[in-house]
Amino acid sequence: MNDTGNKNRAVESERGPFYLSQLRGAQSIVFTKAPYLLSAASVAGSKEAQGPLGKCFDLTNEDDLFGAETWEEAESNMQKEACVLALGKSHVDPKSVRYLFGGDLLRQGIATSMGVEDLQIPIFGLYGACSTSGEALALAAMSVAAGYGDYMLAVTSSHFGSAEKEFRFPLGYANQRPLSAHWTVTASGAFLVGSHLNKIHSDKQRQRKSQFRHIRITGVTIGKIVDFGLKDSQNMGACMAPAATDTIYRNFQDLGRTQEDYDQIITGDLGYIGQSILFDLMKSRGYDIRKKHMDCGMTIFDQETQDTHAGGSGCGCAASTLASYILPKIENGEWKKILFVPTGALMSTVSFNEGASVPGIAHAIMIEHC
């Protein structure tokens, strides 16, 4: 046996065949025992409430400050509400949750740290820009599948006011926006991932149907950073589309699949410009995904009436759309299998001011009706 064979046998002996059996290709995992997505909750702002998904959100507020004094505190309040709602739907006490995976767009992840501190759940703070919901869900599902705990919580958020202050201009400045710019979504999405379905203890719980009973995360494809050298932070769709292409293509290659194996391939916030680039890049690799594609940033707002230019963006865009609109369709069997691919533009105010390019990242989550 050659050195590679000896090495593989040593790894299998150390980690066990169970570990190796879940790996697929270069970047993917298919879970031997797929975790359940038990519940999800969405909290959104006033503009989102006026959009096409307004009636789908669990909680909306006409006051985008959510009773707070600052945009940052408002975003934290959204995260807290989303987590409490998600846990409440599944009747799970925060003390039963092993780990929380969360993040946002702000420096040092302050929206998350201030938002979830009262829950007192051990936390991994994440940053994947607008792909954070995918990163959090992937890690939560991997942790449950590995046996590290029965319950994991994933949460993320964004806020138009806090993002404008952080990355662009204070709202009072009233700067003009190019048509390629996105509108940061004011929303939060939280998801409870578990190893088993909880028992329904009463007719009231059964009637509410608040807990999902037919959704599993069957696998993930973890993305790589892809940088095409673009520097225009007001055209994030173009910056993120190459990363989305790379991850979707890798999912197809790792698993021997095509777009026909999914009811929907759903990106996070490529918007109208990014979607067009994604179609071209995927076609150059031999795949036509046009009839299967949906983008959360194009879904959450009405482009004609809400003047959001290229579409919605932000961590809360993909997260709240998944929680409010996509998962119910999987639960009722309308969609049997989707590939959820949140996308992120990895930039900061420092990198932008120094003239650095804007790399992209995308993670793919395979979610199925069961």
Where are these regions (language model features)?
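Condensing-enzyme catalytic core mediating Claisen C-C bond formation in acyl metabolism
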Residues: 2-72, 170-249, 254, 291-307, ...
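Conserved beta-ketoacyl condensing-enzyme motif
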Residues: 37, 72-131, 261-276
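Short beta-strand segments
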Residues: 38, 101-103, 152-158, 193, ...
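Short, well-ordered amphipathic alpha-helical segments that serve as non-catalytic structural scaffolds
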Residues: 75-91, 137-139, 239-254, 321-326
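Acidic, glycine-rich active-site loops and adjacent beta-strand->loop/helix elements
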Residues: 103-108, 130-131, 156-162, 223-224, ...
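Active-site-proximal alpha-helical scaffold in enzymes
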Residues: 127-154, 193, 313-334
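Flexible, glycine-rich active-site loops centered on histidine and acidic residues
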Residues: 150-184
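Long, repeat-rich segments with strong aromatic
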Residues: 243, 249-281
